[in-house]
């Protein structure tokens, strides 16, 4: 093989790796668009009936009169772990009387979900979807996924992927939940 062909072959093998690396770096620096997808969500609102790590069973009446974010996550999911601090920040900012953020752990033992919450300082209620039933009922296939309900209990948005909930666009989505 001549030198020219070898150089072209090496370059063609190297370019995809460089493109992936550059894309990751640009995303980390905030130079690309969001790593999430927002779609309208109209329900249906399946039964909730999930236990949290304290033993409380959560039902729809527990959520009435406030906006709600149902965040499906798992401790093995890197984007889930990355967005969790910003979920805690918006929950702290608005308070549970106005915005209730429920972190719904997907198919992990309660001890693992509780350990994650303790080591990360997470104070959100952590609900346990140990069988994946709730995720299945609501069509959750990507982690993290957040389902948003307005303060009248109406389903509004489905967000797939990692979100910085303290940034402008997600903040507008949250504010829109109080306008109902």
Residue positions per predicted region:
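Short, internal strand/loop/helix patches
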Residues: 102, 114-152
